[in-house]
Amino acid sequence: ISNNPILGGGSADGAGLTISSQFTENVGASLFWLRAENDNAGSNSVKQYSDAMDFVGLTVPMTFDGVKVTPWGMGGIIGHDSFKGGNFDLNYPMAQGMLPLMGTSTIVANSDKDHGSAWFGGVSADLSYFDPFRFALDAAYGSVDLGTSKLNGKNFDVKRSGWYAALLAEYKLESCTPGLLFWYSSGDDANAYNGSERLPSIDPDVYV
């Protein structure tokens, strides 16, 4: 429907590799690896083991007459020093997208995990079979778990998980294409210590 709220709208960059194949006329697949952050702690002479962030994902685009559907999934390993070497504030976009509110650099550094985990899954669909009507769907769920830390003497979950869904309906005219866009996402509850219930984003272009 629009830019991806998890990986951004094309402005993100990083080392990676993509392998794609077309199995049939209608079904293909792409396997990818992304190193979103690397060598963010230590020096050239001191090798750190918790300062990189890696993701592996799979998309399976399927195209039929008037219908396109792409389910996808992605998993990741997140070193707790991969956020600018553990020296960041919440103006850092990746921290804004992946950490809960109050998830500062000190909170992350004191977590009981050297490496956290992340996983995402979703589906996008486009229906043009009923042209000039067009319908599109985009939905995703994601979770990031960097363990448990301490805040004000209490356990603080350095976790974030949530979902969003968007639906688009359009009608194509000769001069323009009016449409309606509906979207909804999960949100935080009243407990700031049990993690965030918002969708995590690696490089957010649209915050949800």
For the regions a protein language model found, what residue spans apply to each?
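Flexible glycine-rich, low-complexity coil/linker segments exposed to the extracellular/periplasmic environment
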Residues: 193-208
